[in-house]
């Protein structure tokens, strides 16, 4: 069985842990507890191939900036996450997460993921954003950012409703099993 290491990064509170818990246990966690580091594992079949998917949850908070890269070596694929209802987390993909990931892992495939899809059409959430003269991130905006950072895919999901959830991890596995031909074959990560 092939083992694939997937590291999940993004701002604090964008839903990285909920994403992983919902996917691996089919249950949505009730309370928010900021992560330092956690690992999850799932044995899955993708395109008739058995895969052991190692999922590495990381801390989004700045306090862990020096610790986080310790989880990067030998990463096969990154999920860079932002919340569809947090424009600041969307901006931080380009300003923070993408440059950091690329610095440590220049050729590892990236999937850009918009989380909290269930809240994009939520009236209360939209109103709160409007009060701050903000709006949820649209699918075309996500797609544009994915192109900018040269991610292999742009996906959106909801850990709460599980809409699009399985697709995220299937596509992460496919990014490793069926790499895009323009990318170099060497995918190992190294710390400098």
Curated annotation (Swiss-Prot):
Residues 190-192 form a propeptide. The modification N6-acetyllysine is found at residue 147. This is Ras-related C3 botulinum toxin substrate 2. Signal peptide: none annotated. Interacts with DOCK2, which may activate it. Interacts with S100A8 and calprotectin (S100A8/9). Found in a complex with SH3RF1, MAP3K7/TAK1, MAP2K7/MKK7, MAPK8IP1/JIP1, MAPK8/JNK1 and MAPK9/JNK2. Interacts with PAK1. Component of the phagocyte NADPH oxidase complex composed of an obligatory core heterodimer formed by the membrane proteins CYBA and CYBB and the cytosolic regulatory subunits NCF1/p47-phox, NCF2/p67-phox, NCF4/p40-phox and the small GTPase RAC1 or RAC2. It comes from the Eukaryota. GTP binds at residues 10-17, 57-61, 115-118. Plasma membrane-associated small GTPase which cycles between an active GTP-bound and inactive GDP-bound state. In its active state, binds to a variety of effector proteins to regulate cellular responses, such as secretory processes, phagocytose of apoptotic cells and epithelial cell polarization. Regulatory subunit of the phagocyte NADPH oxidase complex that mediates the transfer of electrons from cytosolic NADPH to O2 to produce the superoxide anion (O2(-)). It is a lipid-anchor. GO terms for molecular function: GTP binding; GTPase activity. It is found in: Cytoplasm; Membrane. Keywords: Acetylation, Cytoplasm, GTP-binding, Hydrolase, Lipoprotein, Membrane, Methylation, Nucleotide-binding, Prenylation. Its EC number is 3.6.5.2. Belongs to the small GTPase superfamily. Rho family. The gene is RAC2. InterPro entries: P-loop_NTPase, Small_GTP-bd, Small_GTPase, Small_GTPase_Rho. Its main location: cytoplasm. SMART domains: RAB (SM00175), RAN (SM00176), RAS (SM00173), RHO (SM00174). It is an enzyme of class 3 (hydrolase). GO terms for cellular component: cytoplasm; membrane. GO terms for biological process: small GTPase-mediated signal transduction. The modification Cysteine methyl ester is found at residue 189. It comes from Cavia porcellus (Guinea pig). The keyword DNA damage does not apply.
């Amino acid at each position: 069985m092939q083992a694939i290491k997937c590291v999940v990064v993004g701002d604090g509170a964008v839903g990285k842990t909920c994403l992983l818990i919902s996917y691996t246990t089919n249950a949505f966690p009730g309370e928010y507890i900021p992560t330092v580091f956690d690992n999850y594992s799932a044995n899955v079949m993708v395109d008739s191939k058995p895969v052991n998917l190692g999922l590495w949850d990381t801390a989004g908070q700045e306090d862990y900036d020096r610790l986080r890269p310790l989880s990067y070596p030998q990463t096969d694929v990154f999920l860079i996450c932002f919340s569809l209802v947090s424009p600041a987390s969307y901006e931080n993909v380009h300003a923070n997460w993408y440059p950091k990931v690329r610095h440590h892992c220049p050729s590892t495939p990236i999937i850009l993921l918009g989380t909290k899809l269930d809240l994009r059409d939520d009236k209360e959430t939209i109103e709160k954003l409007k009060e701050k003269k903000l709006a949820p991130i649209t699918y075309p905006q996500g797609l544009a950012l994915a192109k900018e950072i040269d991610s292999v895919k742009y996906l959106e999901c909801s850990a709460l409703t599980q809409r699009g959830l399985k697709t995220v991890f299937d596509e992460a596995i496919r990014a490793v099993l069926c790499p895009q031909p323009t990318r170099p074959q060497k995918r190992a990560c190294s710390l400098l």
